Amino acid sequence: MSEETGAADTLTNGEDHLPQVALIAQYVKDLSFENPSAPGIYQAPEQPKIDVQFNIGSQQAGEDVYEVALKIEIKATQGDLTAYAVELVYAGLFGIRNVPEEHLPPFLLAEAPRLLFPFARRVAADAIRDGNFPSLVLEPIDFGALYMQQAEQQTALAESQPAGEA
């Protein structure tokens, strides 16, 4: 008689091979609020012009652990005066196991920032409000679309580069 083994018996623990992603921690890594034109700026009659810039970075922090940092810079100006400037780096540690290498960049540069953004937005809004300025609510950002746009630009750039000579 021969013994038959099922597919389930060939793996010691099938769940060990499934992709797993978990948010381990999220935190303010760096926060700066500057109010260089106080107290005169509070008497200015007009609303400040707001400029918002953001950047996303990721790095491996350990085995199966990645840090994703969302940097937000907000500058409010009235004429040639700076009403306030906020620089925030809000980061998260993500545990990632059994995810194919080609799927890491979309997660680290699109999905992870999407998860962090609401919390970073609140920290920035609180800092601005605590500086005695009208609270600023940042509009949601479509990080997935931005990632796709950047990936397409990089592909187009790579294709436009002349091939090296052998």
UniProtKB/Swiss-Prot annotation:
Stated family: Belongs to the SecB family.
Keywords from the named record: Chaperone, Cytoplasm, Protein transport, Translocation, Transport
Main location class: cytoplasm
Subunit details: Homotetramer, a dimer of dimers. One homotetramer interacts with 1 SecA dimer.
NCBIfam families registered for this protein in UniProt: PRK05751.1-3, secB
Organism: Rhizorhabdus wittichii (strain DSM 6014 / CCUG 31198 / JCM 15750 / NBRC 105917 / EY 4224 / RW1)
CC per GO annotation: cytoplasm
Molecular-function GO term, any one: unfolded protein binding
Pfam families per record: SecB
Cellular localisation: Cytoplasm
Keyword rRNA processing: no
Role this protein plays: One of the proteins required for the normal export of preproteins out of the cell cytoplasm. It is a molecular chaperone that binds to a subset of precursor proteins, maintaining them in a translocation-competent state. It also specifically binds to its receptor SecA.
A single GO BP: protein transport
Name of protein: Protein-export protein SecB
